[in-house]
């Protein structure tokens, strides 16, 4: 068994999401907007819903407009349940 599988089983199944940073004004915290797309059961129209979540950014490296990957984690504060894994694309 690989090392990644062992660590994932110890931590449990954690959701990894991708979104854009909309705020970085707090210390060690970023606000990421996540988009979810679902198809309506009857009319088959694609519905988009947006949700803003707070994520932990230890080094304060993410900026507004960056495309980031975040991972679900234990509650770090009242509102913070995600942590920054990587910056996929920096804002222009």
From Swiss-Prot:
Signal sequence residues: none
Gene3D superfamilies, per database record = Nucleic acid-binding proteins
Could you name the Gene Ontology cellular component terms for this entry?
A: cytosolic small ribosomal subunit
Q: Which keywords belong to this entry?
A: Ribonucleoprotein, Ribosomal protein, RNA-binding, rRNA-binding
Tell me which PROSITE patterns the record gives.
RIBOSOMAL_S17
Please name the GO terms of the biological process aspect recorded for this protein, alphabetically. translation
InterPro entries from the UniProt entry: NA-bd_OB-fold, Ribosomal_uS17, Ribosomal_uS17_bact/chlr, Ribosomal_uS17_CS
A GO molecular-function annotation: structural constituent of ribosome
Please tell me whether the keyword rRNA-binding is annotated for this protein.
Answer: yes
Q: Name one Pfam family in it.
A: Ribosomal_S17
Superkingdom in the source lineage: Bacteria
Asked whether the UniProt record includes Flavoprotein among its keywords, one would answer no
> In which family does this protein belong, per the annotation?
Belongs to the universal ribosomal protein uS17 family.
**How does the record describe its quaternary structure?**
Part of the 30S ribosomal subunit.
Function (record text): One of the primary rRNA binding proteins, it binds specifically to the 5'-end of 16S ribosomal RNA.
Q: What is this protein called?
A: Small ribosomal subunit protein uS17
Its gene name is: rpsQ
